[in-house]
Each structure stands twice: as C-alpha cells, then as structure tokens.
Amino acid sequence: MVMTDPIADLLTRVRNANIARHEAVEIPASNIKKAIANIMLQEGYITDLEEYNDGAVPMLKITMKYGQNKERVITGLKRISKPGLRVYCRKDEVPKVLNGLGTAVISTSKGILPDKEARKLSIGGEVLCYIW
C-alpha cells in the first residue's frame, strides 16, 4: 500500500507511542522523516534517534523521552501543511507555537528547519507541523 502522507504517519506513530508510554517507536525511514526526527532530537522532545537497515526497508528507531514519573515530554503533535492543502509562510510570518514554548517545523530552501532557525535566517517556507 502506498503511503500518501509520510509526515502524518511519523507524527501519528510518535503520538501513539507517547500516549501508550512506549520506550521506543520504529518507523520506515526517509530523508524528510530523518530531518523532522533530528529537529525533535535537537529541541529535546526525544532521547535518541537511530537508523538501521531491516532487510529491504531502512528504519528509524526513535527513543521516546519522559519525565520523572513517566510524564510526557511531547504534549502534542499537529500536521499543518497537508497534501490536499499546503500552508506556506513568508519570512515575517513564521509561526510561534505556544508563544515560543513549542516548535514549528518548516521546509525551506535551506532544508527542513525549526521555526527559531528560520526566523534567524530570515526565510519562510512550507509549515510542515507543530510540536509542543
């Protein structure tokens, strides 16, 4: 079966693992999923990111991050720009998630960047998702 929205698949798998308080989640790898997972790692939403080859399909293993008493670090994940309705922003319209407490993931001409980096470089792009 062909996956129509791999970013939504990544977010859904991470959201479900987070709700069920799983230690880790495995997803089929792609360059865009790797870039989004790297941003999650840089921003402190996940503990570890590992890529391995499981036969014909390369996989990503994302180790989830929890607080002291298994409190969730990721409160929410939301897909913004969808295949049926793309959402773009100009350099002066880069969104802030929860007044800067969350992260917007933006696909720019310089690659996939968090909102803070896009603001610093003064570039806009396609708003892929929000993480908070």
From Swiss-Prot:
This molecule's function is given as: One of the primary rRNA binding proteins, it binds directly to 16S rRNA central domain where it helps coordinate assembly of the platform of the 30S subunit.
Q: What is this protein called?
A: Small ribosomal subunit protein uS8
Gene giving rise to this polypeptide: rpsH
The Gene Ontology biological process annotation of the record reads: translation
Q: Name one GO cellular component term.
A: ribosome
Which GO molecular-function terms appear in the entry?
rRNA binding; structural constituent of ribosome
Q: Partners and quaternary state?
A: Part of the 30S ribosomal subunit. Contacts proteins S5 and S12.
The record's annotation in SUPFAM superfamilies points to: Ribosomal protein S8 (SSF56047)
Keywords (alphabetical) are: Ribonucleoprotein, Ribosomal protein, RNA-binding, rRNA-binding
Spell out the Pfam families in the cross-references. Answer: Ribosomal_S8
Q: Does the keyword Ribonucleoprotein apply?
A: yes
Q: Which superkingdom heads the taxonomic lineage of this protein's source? A: Bacteria
Q: Which PROSITE patterns match?
A: RIBOSOMAL_S8
- The UniProt entry's coiled-coil ranges are none
| Family recorded in the similarity comment | Belongs to the universal ribosomal protein uS8 family.
**Transmembrane region(s):** none
